[in-house]
C-alpha cells in the first residue's frame, strides 16, 4: 500500500508532527565487543571534572581517591563537580521550610519499610555483579550465591529473611579478616568423539574453594561491574553503565525508598510517577506559572539539559543530604541510610572484558584482560587508547579502577531528583527577593525551568541566578544544549508541551508488532498495545484500524498462518487448508489456525478465544481448550499475564494482557547448549528454587498465599500446614485413617531429617 508521506502533513499542526523526527523506527544500535574503553572514558572524565579536589588514599584498599567537595568555586562555564556542602545543606533546609514535615514523614514511612522488606526484594532486577564469581549473573542467582558464602563463613543473621538482617551480615562480612568462597572454573580437554571420530573439546565444570583476604574482599564488595548501554537511539557514541553487587544493592534500595517517599510529596518531581499521572502533575506546575504571570509579567521556559549529571554528582554530597534529612531520627536508621553513599565514595569500577587483539595475518586473536592493563607495554595500542590507559593507570587495582567522585548511571535517581528540586524550590519570590522568580520540573537529570519576570532583563537575571545556584551543588546546566521559549512550548522527558501535552506517538512505535512469545500471547499483546495507545497516546480510530490490519498481516507472516482460503503457499498452508475445509463454522477458527480476523477497534479488549468461542465447531473447542491435550500449557490459568514491551526510551516496561490458556500458549524449551557451560550449576540452582517455590505454593494456594512473615522456615511452614489439612480432611471423612497415619509419619520423618541436618 503506497502512501505519499507528504499527504500526512497537509492538515497537521507542526507541533503534532514532532514525533516523525524521532529516531524510533528500525532496529536500535547495539554495542559489540568490549565496554572497557567506554568505562575508562567515564572514569577519566569524572576525575577531570573534579581534578582540583584533594587526593587521599583509602587505608583499607590502598585505592587513591579524589575528593572535590568544597573545592574551588568555578570561574568559567566548564562542567565541574565541586559541590559546596553548606550550600547543599541550606537548599535542604529551605526545601523543608517550604514543605513542613516532609522529611520527618518520609523517614517514618521508610523506617516502616526497612522493618518489613524481605531479602527477596533484591532478586528483582536484571543482571547483577556476582562478586563470588567475579562476573554478571541474574539477580536471584547472585543473591543466592552471596547468602551461601555468608552462611559458610558463619554469618547467619539473614536466616529470618528480612533485608535489614542481610545488611547486618554485609556489615559484619567487611570486618572479617578473610572470606572463603567457592568459584567455578572450566577444564577443557580434547577427546575423540566416538560417533564422528573427530576431535572435540570437552568441558568439565569444577568448583574450588578460594580464600579472599580482607582487602580483596572489600575491593569486590565495593565493585561496580560495567557494561555498554545497548539500544540507545539518536547517539553515535556508546556509553558505559554500571551494575552493583549485592552488598551495595540493599543499602541503595533503602536510600531510594526514602528519596522516593520525598519525591512523591514534591510537586516539581517527575519521579516516581509516569505516564498520564506525570503529565497531569507537570501540567499543574505550568498552569500555576502561566496564571501567575498576569499581563504585566513575561514567562519563559527553558528546555534544560545538564552536562554529565552523574559524573558531577558526588556521593559525599548525598551523605550530607541524608545526614540532614534524618537528623532527628534514631541512630540505627541514620547509620543504615548513610552506608550506601559511604560505599559509593569508595567504589571501584570494574573495567570489563579488556581488549581483543588480532595479528595482521589474521591467524591469531588474543584477549588482553583488564587486569593486564596496569603492566602491559603500551606500544600495541593506538594513540587514543594509549592516552586513556596512561591516565587511568594510577587508579588501577586488580583490574578495577578507583572511582570515588561521580555516581554511575541510574543509581540514585530519586535522591538526585530531590537535590534538583531543592534548587527549583529556591525560585520563590520570598527567596529570590527580587522581581524575578522561577519554578520548574525535575526528573533525574532532565529538567524544565519556568522563569517569570517583568521584562527581558529580569528573565536573563533569573536564568543566570539559577545557573550559578546549580553550580554550587555540582549541577551543570549546559548553555549549548538548553534552549528558551515563551512558556507554553517546551519538552521534558520526551513529553512535548504545547498548551498541553502533545502525544509523542513515535516513542511507542517499537512496541507495535509481533513479540515472538507464542501465538496466543502475541495476538493478545498486539491488540492490547493498540488499545492502550488509543487510550493514552492519541492514536485515532482510523490509524488504529490501520495499525490493526498491519498487525494481523505481520502476525500471519510471522506464524505462517494465512487464511485457509488464501493462495499464499507456506510450510503450514497444507495443514491449514485441510483444517479450513473440514471446519463448518470458519469464522470460529483462530487467526493462528488460518481463521479470519474478527478484531476491530471496538472489541480489542476481548481475548480472541472468547471473541470466537460461540462461533467455534464443538470438536475445535475441545481440541483448543482441552486440559488433557498435551500441547495445552499446563500452567495454572492466570487471567492476566505480564508482557515486557520496549518503549523507545527508558527501561522495558511491563504491560498486562489477558491470557487464555489454549493449545497455542506453548512455552519453548530452553536451549540445550547452556548445559555444557559453567552456567550449568546456576541452572540447576534455579530449577531447585523453582521446584521449592512450586511445592510451597501447592501447600499455600494463592487465596491464602502471603509471603511467610516470621521466623519459621519454608519446610516447617509446609509440614505444619500438611498436618492441619490432613486432620481436617480426616475428621470430615475425606481421607481414611491409614492415609492420615501415613501423612503424619511422613511429616515426622521430614522433621527428623531437618534436625539431623
UniProtKB/Swiss-Prot annotation:
GO CC terms, sorted: host cell cytoplasm; host cell nucleus
Keyword Nucleotidyltransferase assigned: yes
The RdRp catalytic domain, residue ranges: 286-483
Residue stretches spanning the membrane: none
Record's comment on post-translational modification: Phosphorylated by host PRKCA.
GO BP annotations, alphabetical order: DNA-templated transcription; symbiont-mediated suppression of host gene expression; symbiont-mediated suppression of host mRNA transcription via inhibition of RNA polymerase II activity; viral RNA genome replication; viral transcription
Protein name as it appears in the record: RNA-directed RNA polymerase catalytic subunit
UniProt source species: Influenza A virus (strain A/Turkey/Ontario/6118/1968 H8N4)
Gene: PB1
Amino acid at each position: 500500500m503506497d502512501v505519499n508521506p507528504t499527504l500526512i502533513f497537509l492538515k497537521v499542526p507542526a507541533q503534532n508532527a514532532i514525533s516523525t523526527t524521532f529516531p524510533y523506527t528500525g532496529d536500535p544500535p547495539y554495542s559489540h565487543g568490549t565496554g572497557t574503553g567506554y568505562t575508562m572514558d567515564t572514569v577519566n572524565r569524572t576525575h577531570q571534572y573534579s581534578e582540583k579536589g584533594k587526593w587521599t588514599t583509602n587505608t583499607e584498599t590502598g585505592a587513591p581517591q579524589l575528593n572535590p567537595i568544597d573545592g574551588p568555586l568555578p570561574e568559567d562555564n566548564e562542567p565541574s563537580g565541586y559541590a559546596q556542602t553548606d550550600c547543599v545543606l541550606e537548599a535542604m533546609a529551605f526545601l523543608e521550610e517550604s514543605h513542613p514535615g516532609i522529611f520527618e514523614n518520609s523517614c517514618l514511612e521508610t523506617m516502616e519499610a526497612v522493618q518489613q522488606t524481605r531479602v527477596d526484594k533484591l532478586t528483582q532486577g536484571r543482571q547483577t555483579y556476582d562478586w563470588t564469581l567475579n562476573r554478571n549473573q541474574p539477580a536471584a542467582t547472585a543473591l543466592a550465591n552471596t547468602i551461601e558464602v555468608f552462611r559458610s563463613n558463619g554469618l547467619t543473621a539473614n536466616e529470618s529473611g528480612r533485608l535489614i538482617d542481610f545488611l547486618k551480615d554485609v556489615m559484619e562480612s567487611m570486618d572479617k579478616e578473610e572470606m572463603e568462597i567457592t568459584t567455578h572454573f572450566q577444564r577443557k580437554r580434547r577427546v575423540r568423539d566416538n560417533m564422528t571420530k573427530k576431535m572435540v573439546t570437552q568441558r568439565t565444570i569444577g568448583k574450588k574453594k578460594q580464600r579472599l583476604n580482607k582487602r580483596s574482599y572489600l575491593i569486590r564488595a565495593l565493585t561496580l561491574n560495567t557494561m555498554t548501554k545497548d539500544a540507545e537511539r539518536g547517539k553515535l557514541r556508546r556509553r558505559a553503565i554500571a551494575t552493583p553487587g549485592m552488598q551495595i544493592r540493599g543499602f541503595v534500595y533503602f536510600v531510594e525508598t526514602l528519596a522516593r517517599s520525598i519525591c512523591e510529596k514534591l510537586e516539581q518531581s517527575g519521579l516516581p510517577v509516569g505516564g498520564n499521572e506525570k503529565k497531569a502533575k507537570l501540567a499543574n506546575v505550568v498552569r500555576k506559572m502561566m496564571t501567575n504571570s498576569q499581563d504585566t509579567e513575561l514567562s519563559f521556559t527553558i528546555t534544560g539539559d545538564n552536562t554529565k549529571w552523574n559524573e558531577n554528582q558526588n556521593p559525599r554530597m548525598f551523605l550530607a543530604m541524608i545526614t540532614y534529612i534524618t537528623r532527628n531520627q534514631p541512630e540505627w536508621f541514620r547509620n543504615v541510610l548513610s552506608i550506601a553513599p559511604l560505599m559509593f565514595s569508595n567504589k571501584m569500577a570494574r573495567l570489563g572484558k579488556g581488549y581483543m587483539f588480532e595479528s595482521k595475518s589474521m591467524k591469531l586473536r588474543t584477549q588482553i584482560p583488564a587486569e593486564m592493563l596496569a603492566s602491559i607495554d603500551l606500544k600495541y595500542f593506538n594513540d587514543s587508547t594509549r592516552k586513556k590507559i596512561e591516565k587511568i593507570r594510577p587508579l588501577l587495582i586488580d583490574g578495577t579502577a578507583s572511582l570515588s567522585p561521580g555516581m554511575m548511571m541510574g543509581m540514585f535517581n530519586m535522591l538526585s531528583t530531590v537535590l534538583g528540586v531543592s534548587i527549583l524550590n529556591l525560585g520563590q519570590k520570598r527567596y529570590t527577593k527580587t522581581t524575578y522568580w522561577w519554578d520548574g520540573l525535575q526528573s533525574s537529570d532532565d529538567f524544565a525551568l519556568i522563569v517569570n519576570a517583568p521584562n527581558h532583563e529580569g528573565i536573563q537575571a533569573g536564568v543566570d541566578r539559577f545557573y550559578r545556584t546549580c553550580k554550587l551543588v555540582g549541577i551543570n546546566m549546559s548553555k549549548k544544549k538548553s534552549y528558551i521559549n515563551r512558556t507554553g512550548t517546551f519538552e521534558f522527558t520526551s513529553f512535548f508541551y504545547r498548551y498541553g501535552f502533545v502525544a509523542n506517538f513515535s516513542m511507542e512505535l517499537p512496541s507495535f508488532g509481533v513479540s515472538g512469545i507464542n501465538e496466543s500471547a502475541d495476538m493478545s499483546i498486539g491488540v492490547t498495545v493498540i488499545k492502550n495507545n488509543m487510550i493514552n497516546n492519541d492514536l485515532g480510530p482510523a490509524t488504529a484500524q490501520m495499525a490493526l490490519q498491519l498487525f494481523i498481516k505481520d502476525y500471519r507472516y510471522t506464524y505462517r498462518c494465512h487464511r485457509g482460503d488464501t493462495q499464499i503457499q507456506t510450510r503450514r498452508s497444507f495443514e491449514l487448508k485441510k483444517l479450513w475445509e473440514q471446519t463448518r463454522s470458519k469464522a470460529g477458527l483462530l487467526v493462528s489456525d488460518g481463521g479470519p480476523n474478527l478484531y476491530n477497534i471496538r472489541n480489542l479488549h476481548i481475548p480472541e478465544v472468547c471473541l470466537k468461542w460461540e462461533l467455534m465447531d464443538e470438536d475445535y473447542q475441545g481440541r483448543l481448550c482441552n486440559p488433557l491435550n498435551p500441547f495445552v500449557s499446563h500452567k495454572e490459568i492466570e487471567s492476566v499475564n505480564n508482557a515486557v514491551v520496549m518503549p523507545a526510551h527508558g527501561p522495558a516496561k511491563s504491560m498486562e494482557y489477558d491470557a487464555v490458556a489454549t493449545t497455542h500458549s506453548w512455552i519453548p524449551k530452553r536451549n540445550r547448549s547452556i548445559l555444557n557451560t559453567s552456567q550449568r550449576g546456576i541452572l540447576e540452582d534455579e530449577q531447585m528454587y523453582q521446584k521449592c517455590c512450586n511445592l510451597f505454593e501447592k501447600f499455600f494456594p494463592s487465596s491464602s498465599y502471603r509471603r511467610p512473615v516470621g521466623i519459621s522456615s519454608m519446610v516447617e511452614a509446609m509440614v505444619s500446614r500438611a498436618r492441619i489439612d490432613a486432620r481436617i480432611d480426616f475428621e470430615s471423612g475425606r481421607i481414611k485413617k491409614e492415609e492420615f497415619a501415613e501423612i503424619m509419619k511422613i511429616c515426622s520423618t521430614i522433621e527428623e531429617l531437618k534436625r539431623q541436618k
